[in-house]
Amino acid sequence: MTVKEIKEILNAEVISGDEKELLSEIKMGCGCDLMSDVLSFIKSNTLLLTGLTNRQVIYTAEIAEIKVICFVRGKKPDKEVIDLAKQKNIILLRTELPMFESCGKLYKAGLIGCSEGE
């Protein structure tokens, strides 16, 4: 599934990332607010859905090779976090949907979870 498709399914706003980056393919998704779980279970090239908007999310994404983060529940990171994501080439999205609904919509549309991936 492309980032653009994810954006459309979640009716999300692009916080950082250009049109070319939105064509990137994402293999699977994960909804999580506990960054230690992200490091334990998530695979590379995964979409992370989270309600956390601090710098730690960006650093965790970098370590886990996550290319896209979508903030749920209308959360918006501050400028410092957005700038850090741009430096690390991490695409940021934002949706008004809660995490459960976001995960459900994406799963229904065919995006698998990390437990189902390779």
Q: Where are the regions a protein language model picked out?
A:
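An N-cap/entry alpha-helix motif that binds or orients negatively charged groups
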Residues: 7-29
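Feature captures the catalytic cores and cofactor-binding loops of soluble hydro-lyases/lyases
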Residues: 21-24, 30-47, 51-118
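Short, structural beta-strand-to-alpha-helix junction motif
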Residues: 2-5, 98
